[in-house]
Structure formats: C-alpha cells, structure tokens
From Swiss-Prot:
This is Major DNA-binding protein. Pfam families: Viral_DNA_bp. One of its GO terms (biological process) is DNA replication. InterPro entries: DBP_sf (IPR035989), Viral_ssDBP_head (IPR043031), Viral_ssDNA-bd (IPR000635). Its main location: virion. It is found in: Virion tegument; Host nucleus. Belongs to the herpesviridae major DNA-binding protein family. GO terms for molecular function: single-stranded DNA binding. Residues 1104-1128 are annotated as: Required for nuclear localization.
Length: 1128
C-alpha cells in the first residue's frame, strides 16, 4: 500500500469545515417530481424514499461531497473536525407521498414485513419518542405543506441520523438553487457539538426516515455479514464510529451459522475464520466508504448529455426511462444468476488436504437454500428455526424460487423491491420448453384478477408483483444449498484503466523494468501504442473507431481493395512492431504466456450509477470482497493460535486487535484491492464557524473557533482488479479440449472466416440479381467452386473476388487462434494483427481466451406480453386485455455481444461480472499472501440468452465447446449519457490528414518507386488544386520525404498538360498508359560489393559479399546470411 500523502495533495485536507449533513426543502410548485420519481425508490403508499445525490436535482451545483464535519466540542472553545464524504443517496421524508411511485404494484410493505419475519431478520423498532414536528426543523416563513423535505447525510454520521442524535438549526438556513427551484437547506450538527446539551425535543428524529434506512441500507449490510439482528448492528456501527473502536471485535456475538458449518469436521476453525472475516469487513468497509473521494463528472445531473435534445419535462422523463432500461440487465443479472452477490450465504472449508490449495481452502459460498435453513449461535445454540418455503426440499429437483426470495434479494425493503420490480419490467420472459404456460392475457384476466391475490386482491392485476413474477418465473434461479467454490457476481462502475484488447496487458512495460540502465531516449513501442497506431492508419482509410466506413464499396473491385488496404495497414504495423521488439531484445515469446486481460472495478461510491439499487450492490460487493481476501489471513492466524474449544467471540477478544492491525499491510495492494493511506490535516489552527450555541436560540453570529482533527489517517480505496489469462497454459485435460485448435480443415471455412459478415452486409451490392442467401452462396462456393455473375458485370472481377475470399479464408483458418467472426473492419484488423503477433510468438496450438461484452440495446415492442403498461386499470377478460394492449408498446432491453470489449471500456461502462479471488504465496521463499481476482462465469440459465450454450456456427455443428474460452461481462457505456464525450483540444485540418496519408504510403512502399501512388492519392484528395501546387506546398505535404517533391511536381505537370479530368481514376489510367503502371520501367542493375571497414577486417577477418537484390542489401543482415561469407 502506498505511503501516507502530505496534506497538500489529498482530498481530505483540502475539504472545508461544515456540518454533519443538511435538510433540503424543495418547493413542490417548481420541483421536477416525476424526474425524482424516475430516479427514486417510491412504492404505492410510501412515506419515505431514497434518491441519488446529484448536483442539479437533489443538491445545488458545486456541492462538495467531501467535508470536515464539526461533530464534537470537548469544551466550548475547541472543536473536533472529522474528514468524511457524503452518503451516495439522500432520504426524502417530508411530503414524500407527493413523489409518484416508480412501481405501482400494491402490497409491497406488508409482503416485506411478513418475509422479514419468515427469514428471521428483526424489524425496525422505533425510538420511544415522537418524530420531530415540522416546526422544529422548518425555517421561519416556509409553509411545510408547500415543500418537499430530504436529508443529505455524511457517511460517518448516518448512524447518528438513524438514532435521532443530530440537531437541525433552522436559523442557519441557506438559500440554494437546485435545478430550476429556489430551495433552502438547514444544517445538521451532532448533539455532542453543544457542551451544555440539547433538549431531546430539539434533536431531529423521523421514524419513517429511520425505518427506511433500517430496511434499504442496514439490512443489506447485515445480510452481507450474515447477521439477523439489524438494530443491534447499527448500534455497534455507531459506537465504532463515535469511539473509534475499529480494532475491537463487535459483531461476533451476533453471528449465526448454518447446519453445514456446525456439522463440519473442523467447525471450530470455520466459525472463527467466518467471524474474524466479518469483523475485519466491519472495521475496514466503513472507513473506506467515509474516506474522501474524487468527484466524478457524472455527479453533475444538470449537464448530463442524456438531456441534450430534450424539450420539456416529458422528454426528460422519457430519456431517464431509456437510461434506466440500459441499466436493467445489471440488476436482472443479480436476480437471475445463481451466483449473485445477493445470494452469498456463508464461508465454507474444503475437506481436501492438497497443499497447493491451502490458502484457497476457505471460500465464500452462495445458495438460497442455505439462507433459509435453521441457524445456531456462536455457542452452538439454535436461534433461527428456518423456513421451509415452496418445495425447498427439492422433491422435483432443486427448490423453486418464490416471491419471498425476491424480497430477500431486495433486503426486505419495499423501496428497493419497488425499484427491482421496475427494472424487471424491462426484461423479456424466456418460456421453458418443458412447462407450457398460459398466455399472459389469460393470467392477468384470470388468476391475477382474483380476490385471492395476497398483494393486490385483484384490483391492480396488470402491475401486481405476482403478475411480474409469473411472467419471468422461468428465468429465476433454482433454490439450492451448494458448498462449491464458485465465482460471485458483482456490479458497479468500471475503473478508468482497463486492458481488454485481444492480448490484454501484453508488453505494457509496467513493473517490468529489471534494471535501471534503460536509456531515456530509447523508444518504447507498447502493445497499447500499436493499437492506437492501427486505429490511426484505419482512420486514414476512412474507417472510424467503431468500424464505420466513409465510402461504402460499390462492387467486387471496391470490396477487395477495401480489405487489401486494411491488410496492408495491419501488416505494416506488425512488421514495425516485431522489429521494435527484436531491436530492444524483448523476450516476447515468454511475455505473451503471462499476459492478462485486466478490468478495474471502481471503489468510488459516487462513480456508481445514480440508482439506490447500485448503492446496495456496491456495498454488498465491497463487503463480500473484503471478507474473501481476509479468509487466508484469518486462517493462518487461527492455525498459529488455535481456538481449542473457544467460541469465536472469546477467541477474538484475545487476538482481534493484532489481526486487525496487520490486515492493512497483509491484504491491501496484494493483487486485488488497491488503496492509499492519506494523512488529513487542517492547515489553520482556527476556522470561521457560526456560533452554534447562539444559533440554537435563533441568533446568528460568527466566531473563530480553535479546531483540530479527531481522526488523522484515512484509508482511500481505489480499485478492485479483475484479470483473465489470455493464453491457455493449464494442464487440465477438459479445459485443454476447449482451447485446443483442431488441425482438420473445416468444410465451412468461408462462412466461419473473416469475410462472412461483410459478404452478408454487402450481399445485395455484390450480387444484386441473385435470390440466394449469402450463407448458402458462399457455402456452396466452398464445395462447388462457382459464384453467380450479375448481368453486365465483369466475370474477371467476380473471379478475383472469389479467389480473394477463398485464399484469405484458407490462410485465416490456418493461422487464426482468435475465435470470433469479425463484424466490423476494426475487429477484422485487430484479429489479423493479433494473429500475426501470436504466430510470431509460436502460439498457434490453442485458441486464446476472450472477453466479450454484453451491451444493452433498448427497443419498443408490442405490449401484449407486458401488462404493466396498462397501469392500475382493471382487466375484465382476456379479450379486453388483448384489445387494451393492441395499440400500446413497451420498452424492453436485450443484450448484444461485442467481439472486442476494448472499445466499450473506453466509454466508462457500468459492469456486471463474476469474480473468483484466488490466493497464493510469492516465489523464492517469499511467504506473503497475494490475491488474484480472476474473471469467472455466470451460473443460471435465465441470466441472458447470449450465455446459453451456442449450437455452433455454420451449417454443421462445430465440435468442441467454445464457452470455456469466452468470458462475458455485462457493460453499459455511460459516455454520452451521464458523462460528456471529450472534445478534441485542436481541430484536425484536412491538410494534416493528406500529409499523414502520403507519409504512410511512402513508409509502406520504401522497397519500390512510390511516386505513382503518391500522385494518385494527391489527385484523389485535392483534385484540381494539384495543378497549382508550389514546391513549398509539395515539400510540406511530403514531410520527411520532401526529396520526392520534384518528381511529384513533374508528374502533376504531365497530368495537367494532358487535359484529363482531375480524378484519381483518370489520373491512374493516364499514368499507366504513359508509364505502363508503377514500377513498369525495367532498369539494368549491377551488383556492387559493400565496403567493409579495415578495422573489422583486421580484427575478425570478416568478408561480406555484396548482394545483387537491389534494395534488399539495405536490410539488416541476419546471422544466417553472414555465416556463409565468414573466412577464418
């Protein structure tokens, strides 16, 4: 982990003093309630809801998310400051019913309460006092009925808000502009700031707000820690925050263990390791969350590009609706995946004795079946009797997923459940072929409209949660109790540094400097630079970064030329790259075996998508990963200090302080979680603050108060790193069969080749008269060697096309180890480029591993299978339902697989991916424990249709499975939606592109006279302006090859004197007639011996014969050509 930073360069020291939070009051008359509803977690009958903290919609522009909160005064003349950041969400509590619900289905609150009791989690217990009256916290002159009230609270003091220990001071109100509304905010200070005490009636408390926090925030934390006494957990978190008890064991007495743990042969160690891992997560996760964070650009709601073309509030709400639809696959994956982080159920220990897996013997497991089993406390006394659930015994196989399991995933919170249901409405159903189901209309008009429905009693069948559950029931995962070591799925924002091109971090030269003798002026041609250069070359050919063409091909000649130009650009870059590696003595054949795809998961809460669901998923993901990386550390400490019959709380009393102290150096920056430690100072001994004692009495004065920091060190998390090995190097026979490349030639080599998708795209352009499909036409050609020729077309051109496609496809099949069929020219170029590199590295036996992105695509479809579009209206019959939905459409989302994830990763995507954290020790006697976050696999057939086993490509099924060599990541780009695209600092002029194109032509054709091609390119780019080019113009355009200026000008003068049209085609035909084409002149060459220095002859006796191969003599002479001329 990095050393502590100085006070000048960390966000904590730069933050300003302020309160522990604010109460915001928004005028109902002008506040965009529908936009807030689309961002929030309202349900039918809600009294409080959560909304993301965003500048321009919930807080004012320029709001600082980092603050030094004044939270205590040990004496009247000294204040304590604590650096913290704000919580990601705000809580709307006053007049919350004015915000429309995001999901209109009734009965969610009662369902959540019943399910919470069924699973054994405690409900919220209100404080023995009434909620604060509006007059206690509303500023004078404001009508409480005309304003919406919400609380923005800091991370370090949210437990104080929950327990009613903050004080609102209305006299210190501030007027702020939130969007188009003139709003007011009132500061919240901790009651410890007032040494003389504050009457309880003046302390701000709202039972609905605290209940919402209990359900939407703290229950999820309790689930991640596998404790059921949520209220007690909040008390412990508050005590830890106030009294700085991070190194004291707290939650172990609250732990509960399933039967599989109690009955384990090594149950004592397993219970201790499980409890210790939870304690470490409780100690470190709050510290990481409350640390100061960078303010991302996506926090500025009023500048979201999403609203650029919106006119009026309806268009803005519709844009938000589409944006939410693009996030739906991430949320639905967490529900439909069997290995979702929401279903992580505990810690298990393998019974195997393999030494190589010692550090991986403890691992996180998941399974809904385990979550509803009975549990025992640390003293092995039963404490939860369990819940049978529907068919949980698995009489028909695994248990059935029920609505109660969905409520569990939503942390028994009606707010989160409503938001989950809203996202699930965008999902398409996948009907099982084994269980035929009635039509949606029949269900809505029949069973859903029955008074027997426990949720809506038949009054709102179209939007009832049971109806949504019925529509998607075949996609929910099975309920099992698994003890396997499988990946778990996490969701959140991607980091800014991802290496997801085909060869990942190959030759990035980071941490690979073995010696410090490298000259500073030596060029470092990295793999990243290679890809950038390739994109630049393609842009000169009129191909943008997404593979789109400026000029579409109009016939077979253009089609072939398009690919030949791309091939030439790729081959030129490959030669230059390989020469650079050889020149710098880089052992690329060894380095390619250890390259990885690298993805980063951002640990900044404010970088996460603006949605309370993603806040919940971020908290769960961080807590789970912290526990996972702590398991081998706890295991080793327990092995050195065995429990010997002690209960986990007893063992932790004697060992936790040492374990917690060492955890920071043992677990951070060891391969998965990166963080930095910052020292927070306040530059001045005093600061200007309001006189809070006077303000409490309604008088506003300022005073200069001496202050000091109550907490100096701050642990700031950065990223979680996930890797995927590119080149297969394992010995597992089953895996080897998935990666090994068959040596038999396939009959369908063309339709599986690199040109097939392009041949299909331009099928009507190439073959306007044929009625054959492109698939059949080219499959037929591979067998019968014949292609149709349109009437009036040149048979020679079509023969050249067929030979080009055939030859290129055969060559591709022989050398290809990247199992994709390119869909655009950028992917085609990168595939050719990387195949050439891998061939040079000798990697031709196995296919490489790929990461494919599943990118959401929203679409409007007929609403027949999406009853929620009807709202709360009644449905009398199936015919009435069909008529009502016949004219309506529903927004749904599907995912499309991308061949290469690198372009998506540049757009700052939201990602959902499965991760497995492996632990290992160093080499050469290094006994430190390192971790590696490896990309895993999704479990569950209902996650997405792209994850179902593909039957194979082509007309015949491919042998061998390809799923093991392809990993998938759900990715939603945010660039252009919530983050503005970067504009170029300087505009590129046309003349710059012309110059770059000419230099590229000359560089590629140094072996031949290139004046012919340069002139044709100039005529194509500049047209008639070529006639007036001066010598200075020609020298500028030719750049470092300006010596060709005279030849180019003479050729242009010849064209001008001929009077032909200034087009590339006319110029080419004219010059071919005059010169006979490029390189047509046949000059006589003589062989000239290359002189050798006298010193060399004297010292080595080396005599080199000159070559008669023209320019070949200028190339580097390799050893094989030098040895024959050696005379001793």
């Amino acid at each position: 982990m990095q050393g502590a930073q100085t006070s000048e360069d960390n966000l904590g020291s730069q933050s300003q003093p302020g309160p522990c939070g604010y109460i915001y009051f928004y005028p109902l008359a002008t506040y965009p309630l529908r936009e807030v509803a689309t961002l929030g977690t309202g349900y039918a009958g809600h009294r409080c809801l959560t909304v993301p903290l965003l500048c321009g919609i919930t807080v004012e522009p320029g709001f600082s998310i980092n603050v030094k909160a004044l939270h205590r005064r040990p004496d009247p003349n000294c204040g304590l400051l604590r650096a913290t950041s704000y919580h990601r969400d705000i809580y709307v509590f006053h007049n919350a019913h004015m915000v429309p619900p995001i999901f209109e289905g009734p009965g969610l609150e009662a369902l959540c309460g019943e399910t919470r009791e069924v699973f054994g989690y405690d409900a919220y217990s209100a404080l023995p006092r009434e909620s604060s009256e509006p007059g206690d916290f509303f500023p004078e002159g404001l009508d409480p009925s005309a304003y919406l009230g919400a609380v923005a609270i800091t991370e370090a003091f949210k437990e104080r808000l929950y327990s009613g220990n903050l004080v609102a001071i209305p006299s210190l109100k501030q007027e702020v502009a939130v969007g188009q509304s003139a709003s007011v905010r009132v500061p919240l200070y901790d009651k410890e700031v007032f040494p003389e005490g504050v009457p309880q009636l003046r302390q701000f408390y709202n039972s609905d707000l605290s209940r919402c926090m209990h359900e939407a925030l703290y229950t999820g934390l309790a689930q991640a820690l596998r404790v059921r006494r949520v209220g007690k957990l909040v008390e412990l978190l508050e005590k830890q925050s106030l009294q700085d008890q991070a190194k004291v064991a707290k939650v172990a007495p609250l732990k509960e263990f399933p039967a599989s743990t109690i009955s384990h042969p090594d149950s004592g160690a397993l219970m201790i390791v499980d409890s210790a891992a939870c304690e470490l997560a409780v100690s470190y996760a709050p510290a990481m969350l409350e640390a100061s964070h960078e303010t991302p650009a996506s926090l500025n709601y009023d500048s979201w590009p999403l609203f650029a073309d919106c006119e009026g509030p309806e268009a803005r709400v519709a844009a938000l609706h589409r944006y939410n639809a693009s996030l739906a696959p991430h949320v639905s994956t967490q529900i439909f995946a069997t290995n979702s982080v929401l279903y992580v159920s505990g810690v298990s220990k393998s019974t195997g004795q393999g030494k190589e897996s010692l550090f991986n013997s403890f691992y996180m497991t998941h399974g809904l079946g385990t979550l509803q089993e009975g549990t025992w406390d640390p003293c092995r006394r039963p404490c939860f009797s369990g819940w049978g659930g529907p068919d949980v015994t698995g009489t028909n196989g695994p248990g059935n997923y029920a609505v109660e399991h969905l409520v569990y995933a939503a942390s028994f919170s009606p707010n989160l459940l409503a938001r989950y249901a809203y996202y699930l409405q965008f999902c398409q159903g996948q009907k099982s072929s084994l269980t035929p189901v009635p039509e949606t209309g029949s269900y809505v008009a029949g069973a859903a409209a029955s008074p027997m429905c426990s949720l809506c009693e038949g009054r709102a069948p179209a939007v009832c949660l049971n109806t949504l559950f019925f529509r998607l029931r075949d996609r929910f995962p099975p309920v099992m109790s698994t003890q396997r070591r499988d990946p778990y799925v996490i969701s959140g924002a991607s980091g800014s540094y991802n290496e997801t091109d085909f060869l990942g971090n190959f030759l990035n030269f980071i941490d690979k400097e073995d010696d410090g003798q490298r000259p500073d002026d030596e060029p470092r041609y990295t793999y990243w630079q290679l890809n950038q250069n390739l994109l630049e070359r393609l842009s000169r050919l009129g191909i943008d970064a997404e593979g789109k063409l400026e000029k579409e091909p109009h016939g077979p000649r253009d089609f072939v030329k398009m690919f030949k130009d791309v091939d030439a650009a790729v081959d030129a870059e490959v030669v230059q790259f390989m020469n650079s590696m050889a020149k710098n003595n880089i052992t690329y054949k060894d380095l390619v075996k250890s390259c990885y795809h690298v993805m980063q998961y951002s640990c900044n809460p404010f970088a996460q998508p603006a949605c309370p669901i993603f806040t919940q998923l971020f908290y769960r993901s961080l807590l789970t990963i912290l526990q996972d990386i702590s398991l081998p550390i706890c295991m080793c400490y327990e092995n050195d200090n065995p429990g010997l019959g002690q209960s986990p709380p007893e063992w932790l009393k004697g060992h936790y302080q040492t374990l917690c102290t060492n955890f920071r150096s043992l677990a951070i920056d060891k391969g998965v979680l990166t963080a930095k430690e910052a020292k927070v100072v306040h530059g001045e001994p005093t600061c200007d603050l309001p006189d809070l004692d006077a303000a409490l009495q309604g008088r506003v004065y300022g005073r200069r108060l001496p202050v000091r920091m109550s907490k100096v060190l701050m642990l700031c998390p950065r990223n979680i790193k996930i890797k995927n090995r590119v080149v297969f190097t394992g010995e597992n026979a089953a895996l080897q069969n998935s990666f090994i490349k068959s040596t038999t030639r396939r009959e369908n080599y063309i339709i599986n080749g690199p040109y097939m998708k392009f041949l299909n795209t331009y099928h009507k352009t190439l073959f306007p008269d044929t009625k054959l499909s492109s698939l059949y036409l080219w499959h037929n050609f591979s067998r019968r060697r014949s292609v149709p020729v349109p009437s009036g077309a040149s048979a020679e051109e079509y023969s050249d096309l067929a030979l080009f496609v055939d030859g290129g496809s055969r060559a591709h099949e022989e050398s290809n180890v990247i199992d994709v069929v390119p869909g655009n020219l950028v992917t085609y170029a990168k595939q050719r480029l990387n195949n050439a590199i891998l061939k040079a590295c000798g990697q031709t036996q196995f296919y490489i591993s790929l990461i494919q992105g599943l990118v959401p695509r929203t679409q409007s479809v007929p609403a027949r299978d999406y009853p929620h579009v009807l709202g709360t209206r009644a449905v009398e019959s199936a015919a009435a339902y069909a008529e009502a939905t016949s004219s309506l459409t529903a927004t749904t989302v599907v995912c499309a697989a991308t061949d290469c994830l690198s372009q998506v990763c540049k757009a700052r995507p939201v990602v959902t991916l499965p991760v497995t954290i492996n632990k290992y020790t160093g080499v050469n006697g290094n006994n430190q424990i390192f971790q590696a976050g490896n990309l895993g696999y999704f479990m569950g057939r209902g996650v997405d249709r792209n994850l179902l086993q593909a039957p194979g490509a082509g007309l015949r099924k491919q042998a061998g499975g390809s799923s093991m060599r392809k990993k998938f990541v759900f990715a939603t780009p945010t660039l252009g939606l919530t983050v503005k695209r970067r504009t170029q600092a300087a505009t590129t002029y046309e003349i710059e592109n012309i110059r770059a194109g000419l230099e590229a032509i000359i560089s590629q054709k140094q072996e031949e006279d290139c004046v012919f091609d340069v002139v044709c390119n100039l005529v194509d780019a500049m047209g008639e302006a070529c006639a007036s080019l001066t010598r200075d113009d020609a020298e500028y355009l030719l750049g470092r090859f300006s010596v060709l200026a005279d030849s180019v000008l003479e050729t242009l003068a010849t064209i001008a004197s001929s009077g032909i049209e200034w087009t590339a085609g006319a110029a080419r035909d004219f010059l071919e007639g005059v010169w006979g084409g490029p390189g047509a002149a046949q000059d006589n060459f003589i062989s000239v011996a290359e002189p050798v220095s006298t010193a060399s002859q004297a010292s080595a006796g080396l005599l080199l014969g000159g070559g008669g191969q023209g320019s070949g003599g200028r190339r580097k002479r390799r050893l094989a050509t030098v040895l024959p001329g050696l005379e001793v």
